[in-house]
Amino acid sequence: MIMRFLKKIPAGMMVVPMLLGAIINTFIPEVTNIGSFTTAIFTSAGANTAIGIQLFCLGTTLRFREMGGVVKRGGVLLISKFVIGAAIGIVVGKVFGPTGVLGLSSLAIISAVTNSNGSVYLALMNSYGDKVDQAAMPLLAINDGPMLTMIAMGLGGLADIPFMALVAAIGPILVGMILGNIDKDLSDFLAPAGSILLPFVGFCLGSGMNLTNIVKGGAQGILLGLVTCFIGGAFIVLCDKFISRRPGYAGWAVATTAGNAVAVPAVIAEADPSWLPFADVATSQVAASAILTAILVPIITSWWAKKYGCPQFPKDEAQKALFEKQA
């Protein structure tokens, strides 16, 4: 009964536990913060570990010859999301100044639009994409944090961060890939674990969210989420379709705001104190965008994937053959 319900919801294996975790963290956080294994598995403390294991298991399914496709697909998604977020934010900043427009500063816009939720992407690619789509997740992790936001706002001086961020993100998947290529039996054994971990990842991430942030972010936070999802997402989908020659479902899957993006305005304000007056408001708006896009994007991605085709739901035999060739 529970499984049938979860399968009816787009990315339900992750989204439903995520919402449950967010509800508990909002109203009764003390239930899961009792220490030991309970806190480790049912709070945000366990998120990175669960995601790391998930990526390791995914890595065991990859062959070295597939890495070119991974870099190409992931690179298009990463760059296009950065370009649209930076472009909107810079234009707003140049035209309207630091206060921005409609209550949204360029700090809030760039922080939200350039950062994507990798776990939502991975869950959606598990439902609609192929293993090359899934393997692009560590590459997309580069935009999860302040680095690209700082670049977009002209705050340099951290040239070693991109390389180290990439190394840290691809470590689990690289080790898994090496072991999987050495021993196919090991690959066959570990491959299913990626899907099994989805609800645990979802709950851990949800336990780091507070639903009251939607209220604190106000109408501007909701507007920011809509900009991230629909304006940013539409641009990424166009790049995915015309550069990568893909149907576009992966483009929608990265049209989110990362949970970690909530900390970005404070980091930027610390680097450039002129942004301090705007940091608190931007933080609440980015938090609202993170929650809203985590709900909207799975619904949109599911609709798009089924309407225009994806590896799990090809439109016709010709598209199915194309997906098999590209996988």
Residue ranges and their predicted role:
Residues 62-72, 95-104, 114-136, 142-143, ...:
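Juxtamembrane helix-boundary/capping and inter-helix hinge elements in multi-pass membrane proteins
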